[in-house]
């Protein structure tokens, strides 16, 4: 596993010399001997717990300073130290990939491999921490999103409940109005039936008035006597009684 892949964020390289003098006593080299690599990895493993997330630049700068001042290593910048460790770990991964059972190694190579094993384990711990942190953060973000959606759903449900209540209220009033309309229609039918009955009675009375012959009993002159008037009154009553009895059987035809 390559060390750069374990880092969460790339940092700006700090190439300024850690030595207070403009020309350091030991020139910086890009290639270290096996002994120098072991010294460097010893420092890395010794301070491995000081490497924390988002502080890798500070860690490599400290290792470079200690290696340069205490161990005499020809590295005195953060970027040079980082690159040397990355190179050592890359070669270590290649050796692991091509290692065969029973392959002979020197004690120095074994020590370097052991130091690389410890450093790789530390990087794995940091990777697990980062993944756990990121997963936890994603869960928090998801929880916030879920809570926001639940809030919106609750508001929408309340609006739906209000609409349902209004529909039920209007439906009840519509039903009441339908019942009232049916009652009004029934009353109208009764009124129409009564009007029809009254119209029949009016037609009946009108027919009776048309069937009475007043000319047969009317006075023939202006000098008619009082006896004739009295007789005509009595006769008219008798005739009307007879007419009513004779006309009534024929009313059914009308």
From Swiss-Prot:
Record's compositionally biased regions (Low complexity) = 16-25
Which GO molecular-function terms appear in the entry? Answer: DNA binding; DNA binding, bending; rDNA spacer replication fork barrier binding; sequence-specific DNA binding; sequence-specific double-stranded DNA binding
Q: Spell out the residue ranges that the record assigns to sequence repeats.
A: 221-224, 225-228, 229-232, 233-236
Output the superkingdom of the source species. Eukaryota
**Keywords in alphabetical order:** Chromosome partition, DNA-binding, Nucleus, Phosphoprotein, Repeat
Q: Which residues carry this modification: Phosphoserine?
A: 17, 19
Residue ranges for the region (Disordered) are 1-30
Q: Name one GO biological process term.
A: replication fork arrest at rDNA repeats
The record's region (4 X 4 AA tandem repeats of G-[ATV]-N-M) falls at 221-236
Name any one Pfam family assigned in the record: Sap1_N
Q: List locations, semicolon-separated.
A: Nucleus
Q: Where is it chiefly localized? A: nucleus
The annotated regions of Basic and acidic residues compositional bias extend over 1-10
- Name any GO cellular component annotation: chromatin
Role description: Binds to sequences required for mating-type switching. Makes a simultaneous contact with both the alpha and beta domains of the switch-activating site SAS1. Also binds to replication fork barrier 1 (RFB1) located within a 78 base pair sequence near the 3' end of the rRNA coding region. This leads to replication fork blockage. It binds the consensus sequence 5'-TA[AG]GCAGNTN[CT]AACG[AC]G-3'.
Return the domain comment text from this UniProt entry: The N-terminus may contain the DNA-binding domain. Last 40 residues of the C-terminus are required for chromosome segregation.
Instruction: Outline the subunit composition.
Output: Homodimer.
Further comment found in the protein's record: Present with 20000 molecules/cell in log phase SD medium.
Q: What is this protein called?
A: Switch-activating protein 1
Query: Which source organism does the UniProt entry give?
Result: Schizosaccharomyces pombe (strain 972 / ATCC 24843) (Fission yeast)
Query: Gene name on record?
Result: sap1
């Amino acid at each position: 596993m390559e060390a750069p892949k374990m880092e969460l964020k790339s940092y700006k390289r700090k190439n300024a010399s850690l030595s207070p003098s403009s020309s350091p006593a030991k020139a910086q080299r890009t290639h270290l001997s096996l002994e120098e690599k072991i010294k460097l990895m010893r420092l890395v493993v010794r301070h491995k717990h000081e490497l924390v997330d988002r502080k890798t630049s500070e860690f490599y700068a400290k290792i470079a300073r200690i290696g340069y001042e205490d161990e005499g290593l020809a590295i005195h910048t953060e970027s040079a130290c980082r690159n040397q460790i990355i190179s050592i770990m890359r070669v270590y991964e290649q050796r692991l990939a091509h290692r065969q059972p029973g392959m002979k190694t020197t004690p120095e190579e074994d020590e370097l491999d052991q130091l690389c094993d410890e450093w790789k384990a530390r990087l794995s711990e940091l990777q697990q921490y980062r993944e756990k942190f990121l997963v936890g953060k994603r869960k928090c973000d998801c929880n916030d999103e879920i809570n926001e959606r639940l809030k919106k759903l609750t508001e929408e449900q309340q609006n739906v409940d209000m609409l349902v209540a209004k529909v039920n209220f209007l439906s009840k009033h519509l039903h009441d109005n339908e019942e009232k309309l049916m009652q009004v229609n029934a009353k109208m039918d009764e009124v129409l039936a009564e009007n029809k009955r009254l119209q029949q009675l009016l037609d009946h009375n009108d027919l009776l008035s048309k069937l009475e012959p007043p000319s047969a009993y009317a006075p023939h002159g202006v000098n008619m006597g009082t006896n004739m008037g009295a007789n005509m009154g009595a006769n008219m009553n008798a005739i009307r009684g007879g007419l009513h009895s004779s006309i009534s059987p024929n009313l059914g035809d009308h």
